[in-house]
Amino acid sequence: MARYTGPLTKKSRRLGTDLVGNDKSFERRPYPPGVHGRGRTKDSEYSLQLREKQKARYAYGVLEKQFRRYYEEADRAQGKTGDVLLQILESRLDNVVYRAGLAATRRQARQMVSHGHFLVNGKKVNIPSYRVSTHDIIDVREKSKDLPPIVIARETFETRDVPAWLEVRPNKGRILVHQLPTRDQIVIDVNEQAIVELYSK
């Protein structure tokens, strides 16, 4: 199954949530694409659960097979399955780069990681799905510090809302992972319990 690479704004409108982050096009038209003015039929429980899964999948850019593996891992772990699932997704390196404000979107962050622009604890990591751990140190590689997204991140850092579980030192191009995120630190418009119910059937 190929990764979806089309316009995310259309997916955002269909699923009713901003999958990109500060998507101006979605803000202007937050209703489903197509003909407007028709009343919506009541969604079934299954379709509501499926929508929540799709929202999470598209937001984090994860394929179905990988998403299911994340769910199965979360289901085996201690704690609430839905909370653990979101923690796993948030802990991906591409998401951490995005949350730290070093990329404008997760897609851009994924591309930057894939191109080898980051070190984790001093070693180059080019796998977007790499999972960070508490006390990890993520650095922009020296030769990558003049990349436009990194320069923009330094210049606009004061306007970024970085989650408390991360610390960013923009002038050094460094991200410190103080802890893994708790549910209340994960800002995503998704009902994770609906995802759990979908996979539990």
UniProtKB/Swiss-Prot annotation:
One of its GO terms (biological process) is translation. Keywords: Ribonucleoprotein, Ribosomal protein, RNA-binding, rRNA-binding. Residues 91-157 form the S4 RNA-binding domain. Belongs to the universal ribosomal protein uS4 family. NCBIfam families: PRK05327.1, rpsD_bact. Gene3D superfamilies: Ribosomal Protein S4 Delta 41, Chain A, domain 1 (1.10.1050.10), RNA-binding S4 domain (3.10.290.10). This is Small ribosomal subunit protein uS4. Pfam families: Ribosomal_S4 (PF00163), S4 (PF01479). One of its GO terms (cellular component) is small ribosomal subunit. Residues 1-45 are annotated as: Disordered. One of the primary rRNA binding proteins, it binds directly to 16S rRNA where it nucleates assembly of the body of the 30S subunit. With S5 and S12 plays an important role in translational accuracy. The keyword Ribosomal protein applies. InterPro entries: Ribosomal_uS4, Ribosomal_uS4_bac-type, Ribosomal_uS4_CS, Ribosomal_uS4_N, S4_RNA-bd, S4_RNA-bd_sf. Part of the 30S ribosomal subunit. Contacts protein S5. The interaction surface between S4 and S5 is involved in control of translational fidelity. HAMAP family: Ribosomal_uS4_B. One of its GO terms (molecular function) is structural constituent of ribosome.
